[in-house]
Amino acid sequence: MLTLESVTKRFGGLTAVRAVRLEVRRGDLLGIIGPNGAGKTTLFNVIAGYYRPEEGRIVFEGRDVTGLAAHAISRLGLTRTFQIVKPFGNLSVADNVMIGALTRLPRVRDARVEAERVIALCGLGPHAAARARALPIGLRKRLEVARALATRPRLLLLDEVMAGLNPSELTGIIDLVRRVHAEGVTLIVIEHVMAAMMRLAQRIVVLHHGEKVAEGTPEFIAGDRRVVDAYLGEEFVLADA
């Protein structure tokens, strides 16, 4: 479904992503982990068309999308969320989601129906009329996912949707990610909440200093000495034992 061929992104003299190769199959739920500054969000921005790579190629569903603008890639069915959520604060939850739907469904009636479906899926029904700026962080995270889903992606990139959530909110967002995946959406998830990632992901990729240093099942990654030393730490291994 998605292939990255030696993708490299530089900012001046800094190489943020270095020769990353990746293969994502339809139906995958792939996790990406790594320390702060490892290049995870930059990689998302390159995949989704916000940054153009200096080297390498990105192929989505058989089409070379390297260098395409983000809006063009989104229309093809590849969309991302953002770690720092910025909804239209003065608009209602329903209107925020409708804006996403209108990018794929030009008729307002159709967009409204799609928005209602996505709002229900994301558990935002009781808050549909609320202004986005009034939502607590847990609901704003759900709204960010809903806005992306309204564009009808086949591949969705989720950037730290669990960050800053309390245990109850975390449980809810994990359930939401599972529901979205069950709807047939292929997912790539960046996350620092490792206990959740270990339960959710079918496969995990580890980035360190912009390079892919490991890839495998959660069990394999938890036992990889390079990953433990660079990121997870002995405390995680002992807690998971």
Question: Model-found features: residue ranges?
Answer:
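Glycine-rich phosphate-binding loops of nucleotide-dependent enzymes
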Residues: M1-A241
